[in-house]
């Protein structure tokens, strides 16, 4: 008897691997900025999440994920490791998708997402120096004046 691999099972494995990769990237970013995720401000958390959404785009392109898979991966990333509620994650993911496809909707967030695409490449190439510089420049630019 021949065992067949269920396409749904393969899909689950691909998404689980992508989710793990995103978590590792967020962990690495937090190490590089010297602040655990749970100690970041809400603004920093949102910036890192938008940056991570750029990584979702990179993974989607690399792994040829369909739109529903990319959406699910985005929501998964916002729930874990960012600890947004399911509804917050859905709403935030929808906002990120809108902003990513319309620069004029929120130019700063659009730029952060696109820098996250570069950040994903830096993470995969183990370019910690480039990744640290990338995220630190963004965080410095969005910090409110004191």
Whereabouts are the PLM-identified features?
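Low-complexity intrinsically disordered segments
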Residues: 89-146
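N-terminal low-complexity, intrinsically disordered segments
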Residues: 1-84
């Amino acid at each position: 008897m021949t065992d067949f691999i269920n396409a749904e099972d393969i899909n689950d494995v691909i998404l689980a691997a992508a989710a793990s990769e995103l978590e590792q990237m967020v962990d690495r970013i937090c190490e590089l900025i010297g602040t655990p995720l749970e100690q970041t401000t809400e603004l920093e958390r949102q910036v890192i999440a938008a940056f991570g959404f750029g990584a979702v785009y990179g993974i989607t392109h690399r792994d040829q994920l369909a739109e529903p898979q990319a959406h699910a991966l985005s929501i998964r990333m916002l729930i874990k490791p960012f600890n947004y509620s399911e509804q917050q994650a859905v709403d935030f993911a929808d906002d990120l998708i809108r902003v990513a496809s319309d620069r004029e909707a929120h130019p700063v967030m659009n730029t952060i997402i696109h820098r996250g695409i570069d950040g994903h490449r830096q993470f995969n190439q183990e370019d910690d120096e480039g990744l640290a510089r990338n995220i630190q420049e963004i965080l410095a630019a969005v910090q409110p004046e004191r």
